[in-house]
A protein has these predicted regions:
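Flexible helix-coil transition and linker loops at the boundaries of alpha-helical arrays
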Residues: 47, 83-85, 119-123
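TPR-repeat structural position
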Residues: 53, 72-73, 107-108, 145, ...
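N-terminal positive-inside, membrane-proximal cytosolic segments immediately preceding the first
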Residues: 1-37
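Acidic, proline/glycine-rich low-complexity intrinsically disordered segments
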Residues: 2-10, 65, 119-123, 127
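Short extracytoplasmic
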Residues: 62-93
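Transmembrane signal-anchor/signal-peptide helices with a preference for the extracytoplasmic
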Residues: 38-58
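Soluble extracytoplasmic domains of inner/organellar membrane proteins
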Residues: 89, 95, 102, 113-212
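Acidic, proline-/serine-/threonine-rich low-complexity intrinsically disordered segments
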Residues: 2, 10, 54-60, 69-76
Length: 212
Protein backbone atom coordinates (compact mmCIF):
# COMPACT_ATOMS: atom_id res chain seq x y z
CA UNK A 1 0.00 0.00 0.00
CA UNK A 2 2.75 2.40 1.00
CA UNK A 3 4.63 1.61 -2.20
CA UNK A 4 1.55 2.42 -4.27
CA UNK A 5 1.09 5.75 -2.47
CA UNK A 6 4.76 6.58 -3.00
CA UNK A 7 4.45 5.70 -6.68
CA UNK A 8 1.38 7.91 -7.04
CA UNK A 9 3.18 10.80 -5.29
CA UNK A 10 6.19 10.37 -7.56
CA UNK A 11 4.03 10.32 -10.67
CA UNK A 12 2.13 13.38 -9.45
CA UNK A 13 5.36 15.24 -8.78
CA UNK A 14 6.76 14.32 -12.18
CA UNK A 15 3.55 15.45 -13.83
CA UNK A 16 3.72 18.79 -12.04
CA UNK A 17 7.30 19.28 -13.20
CA UNK A 18 6.34 18.45 -16.79
CA UNK A 19 3.43 20.86 -16.65
CA UNK A 20 5.61 23.60 -15.18
CA UNK A 21 8.24 23.12 -17.88
CA UNK A 22 5.59 23.05 -20.57
CA UNK A 23 3.89 26.22 -19.36
CA UNK A 24 7.12 28.14 -18.70
CA UNK A 25 9.16 26.75 -21.58
CA UNK A 26 9.59 30.11 -23.32
CA UNK A 27 10.46 31.92 -20.10
CA UNK A 28 13.07 29.32 -19.21
CA UNK A 29 14.66 29.47 -22.67
CA UNK A 30 14.71 33.29 -22.57
CA UNK A 31 16.25 33.27 -19.07
CA UNK A 32 18.97 30.81 -20.12
CA UNK A 33 19.74 32.84 -23.25
CA UNK A 34 19.85 36.08 -21.25
CA UNK A 35 22.18 34.57 -18.67
CA UNK A 36 24.44 33.17 -21.40
CA UNK A 37 24.51 36.56 -23.12
CA UNK A 38 25.41 38.32 -19.87
CA UNK A 39 28.29 35.92 -19.28
CA UNK A 40 29.57 36.43 -22.83
CA UNK A 41 29.28 40.23 -22.51
CA UNK A 42 31.10 40.17 -19.16
CA UNK A 43 34.06 38.25 -20.54
CA UNK A 44 34.02 40.43 -23.66
CA UNK A 45 34.17 43.51 -21.43
CA UNK A 46 37.15 42.07 -19.56
CA UNK A 47 38.89 41.28 -22.85
CA UNK A 48 38.31 44.80 -24.21
CA UNK A 49 39.49 46.31 -20.92
CA UNK A 50 42.67 44.20 -20.98
CA UNK A 51 43.42 45.12 -24.60
CA UNK A 52 42.86 48.80 -23.81
CA UNK A 53 45.28 48.51 -20.88
CA UNK A 54 47.92 46.89 -23.07
CA UNK A 55 47.58 49.59 -25.73
CA UNK A 56 47.80 52.29 -23.09
CA UNK A 57 50.95 50.68 -21.68
CA UNK A 58 52.47 50.59 -25.14
CA UNK A 59 51.64 54.28 -25.68
CA UNK A 60 53.13 55.28 -22.33
CA UNK A 61 56.30 53.23 -22.82
CA UNK A 62 56.76 54.62 -26.33
CA UNK A 63 56.44 58.20 -25.07
CA UNK A 64 58.95 57.72 -22.25
CA UNK A 65 61.45 55.97 -24.54
CA UNK A 66 61.16 58.73 -27.13
CA UNK A 67 61.63 61.38 -24.45
CA UNK A 68 64.76 59.70 -23.11
CA UNK A 69 65.99 59.42 -26.71
CA UNK A 70 65.56 63.20 -27.04
CA UNK A 71 62.54 62.87 -29.33
CA UNK A 72 60.33 65.30 -27.48
CA UNK A 73 57.82 66.41 -30.10
CA UNK A 74 54.25 66.58 -28.74
CA UNK A 75 55.35 64.75 -25.57
CA UNK A 76 53.30 66.99 -23.29
CA UNK A 77 50.09 66.64 -25.29
CA UNK A 78 50.48 62.88 -25.58
CA UNK A 79 51.03 62.48 -21.84
CA UNK A 80 48.00 64.67 -21.09
CA UNK A 81 45.96 62.42 -23.39
CA UNK A 82 46.96 59.43 -21.25
CA UNK A 83 46.02 61.32 -18.08
CA UNK A 84 42.61 62.02 -19.61
CA UNK A 85 42.10 58.29 -20.18
CA UNK A 86 41.48 58.07 -16.41
CA UNK A 87 43.42 54.83 -16.13
CA UNK A 88 44.33 53.79 -12.59
CA UNK A 89 47.89 52.86 -13.56
CA UNK A 90 49.03 54.97 -16.49
CA UNK A 91 47.23 58.26 -15.78
CA UNK A 92 49.16 58.78 -12.50
CA UNK A 93 52.40 57.61 -14.15
CA UNK A 94 51.93 60.09 -17.00
CA UNK A 95 51.33 62.89 -14.49
CA UNK A 96 54.45 62.00 -12.50
CA UNK A 97 56.50 61.87 -15.69
CA UNK A 98 55.29 65.34 -16.69
CA UNK A 99 56.24 66.78 -13.30
CA UNK A 100 59.50 64.92 -12.67
CA UNK A 101 60.90 65.88 -16.05
CA UNK A 102 59.55 69.45 -15.87
CA UNK A 103 57.76 68.99 -19.18
CA UNK A 104 54.87 71.01 -17.82
CA UNK A 105 55.76 74.02 -15.67
CA UNK A 106 52.50 75.95 -15.24
CA UNK A 107 51.33 75.29 -11.68
CA UNK A 108 47.66 75.87 -12.45
CA UNK A 109 47.70 73.36 -15.29
CA UNK A 110 49.56 70.80 -13.17
CA UNK A 111 47.01 71.19 -10.37
CA UNK A 112 44.17 70.71 -12.85
CA UNK A 113 45.78 67.43 -13.93
CA UNK A 114 46.20 66.39 -10.29
CA UNK A 115 42.47 67.03 -9.78
CA UNK A 116 41.69 65.07 -12.94
CA UNK A 117 43.52 62.02 -11.61
CA UNK A 118 42.24 62.37 -8.03
CA UNK A 119 38.58 63.06 -8.83
CA UNK A 120 37.90 61.29 -12.12
CA UNK A 121 40.13 58.22 -12.04
CA UNK A 122 38.99 55.09 -10.21
CA UNK A 123 41.80 54.50 -7.74
CA UNK A 124 42.42 52.32 -4.72
CA UNK A 125 41.98 54.36 -1.55
CA UNK A 126 45.64 54.53 -0.53
CA UNK A 127 46.81 55.19 -4.10
CA UNK A 128 44.44 58.14 -4.16
CA UNK A 129 45.81 59.34 -0.82
CA UNK A 130 49.36 59.05 -2.16
CA UNK A 131 48.47 61.27 -5.12
CA UNK A 132 46.81 63.79 -2.79
CA UNK A 133 50.02 63.81 -0.73
CA UNK A 134 52.10 64.33 -3.87
CA UNK A 135 49.84 67.24 -4.82
CA UNK A 136 50.46 68.77 -1.40
CA UNK A 137 54.21 68.19 -1.73
CA UNK A 138 54.25 69.80 -5.17
CA UNK A 139 52.38 72.87 -3.90
CA UNK A 140 54.14 73.26 -0.54
CA UNK A 141 56.64 75.85 -1.79
CA UNK A 142 54.14 78.39 -3.05
CA UNK A 143 50.70 77.87 -1.47
CA UNK A 144 49.37 79.54 1.66
CA UNK A 145 48.84 77.66 4.92
CA UNK A 146 45.08 77.33 4.41
CA UNK A 147 45.45 76.19 0.79
CA UNK A 148 47.99 73.50 1.69
CA UNK A 149 45.89 72.27 4.62
CA UNK A 150 42.85 72.17 2.36
CA UNK A 151 44.70 69.80 0.01
CA UNK A 152 46.03 67.53 2.76
CA UNK A 153 43.00 67.48 5.10
CA UNK A 154 41.47 64.35 3.48
CA UNK A 155 44.61 62.48 4.60
CA UNK A 156 45.16 64.27 7.92
CA UNK A 157 41.57 63.56 8.99
CA UNK A 158 41.81 59.86 8.11
CA UNK A 159 43.71 56.78 9.23
CA UNK A 160 45.60 56.56 5.96
CA UNK A 161 49.09 55.07 5.81
CA UNK A 162 50.10 58.46 4.37
CA UNK A 163 48.80 60.43 7.37
CA UNK A 164 52.21 60.74 9.06
CA UNK A 165 53.72 61.87 5.73
CA UNK A 166 51.09 64.61 5.41
CA UNK A 167 51.58 65.74 9.03
CA UNK A 168 55.34 65.84 8.55
CA UNK A 169 54.98 67.90 5.38
CA UNK A 170 52.85 70.45 7.27
CA UNK A 171 55.27 70.46 10.21
CA UNK A 172 58.22 71.13 7.90
CA UNK A 173 56.17 73.77 6.07
CA UNK A 174 55.68 75.75 9.28
CA UNK A 175 59.24 75.11 10.49
CA UNK A 176 60.73 76.49 7.25
CA UNK A 177 58.72 79.67 7.82
CA UNK A 178 59.86 80.09 11.41
CA UNK A 179 56.44 79.24 12.87
CA UNK A 180 57.77 76.90 15.54
CA UNK A 181 54.65 76.74 17.71
CA UNK A 182 52.52 75.49 14.81
CA UNK A 183 55.34 73.25 13.63
CA UNK A 184 55.73 71.61 17.06
CA UNK A 185 52.01 70.84 17.15
CA UNK A 186 52.33 68.63 14.07
CA UNK A 187 55.61 66.99 15.14
CA UNK A 188 53.93 66.10 18.45
CA UNK A 189 50.99 64.56 16.60
CA UNK A 190 53.35 62.33 14.62
CA UNK A 191 55.26 61.18 17.70
CA UNK A 192 51.99 60.48 19.54
CA UNK A 193 50.51 58.38 16.73
CA UNK A 194 50.39 54.61 17.12
CA UNK A 195 50.29 53.60 13.48
CA UNK A 196 52.82 55.79 11.73
CA UNK A 197 55.88 55.58 9.53
CA UNK A 198 58.86 54.66 11.79
CA UNK A 199 61.32 56.80 9.81
CA UNK A 200 59.07 59.86 9.92
CA UNK A 201 58.44 59.35 13.64
CA UNK A 202 62.21 59.17 14.25
CA UNK A 203 62.88 62.32 12.21
CA UNK A 204 60.10 64.15 14.05
CA UNK A 205 61.52 63.11 17.42
CA UNK A 206 64.99 64.27 16.36
CA UNK A 207 63.58 67.63 15.30
CA UNK A 208 61.75 68.04 18.62
CA UNK A 209 64.83 67.13 20.65
CA UNK A 210 67.14 69.37 18.64
CA UNK A 211 65.10 72.49 17.99
CA UNK A 212 62.38 72.76 20.65
Amino acid sequence: MDEEIELINTNTRNEKIKNFLSINKKKIIISICALTLLIILYFLFLEIKERRKIKLAERYNKITIEYLSDKKKDIKDRLVEIINENDSTYSPLALYFLIDNQILKQNDEINELFDQVINKTKLEKEIKNLIIYKKGLFNSDFLSESELLNILNPIINSESVWKSHALYLIAEYFYSRGEKVKSKEFYDKIVGMQNNNPHIKLESQKRLNRDF
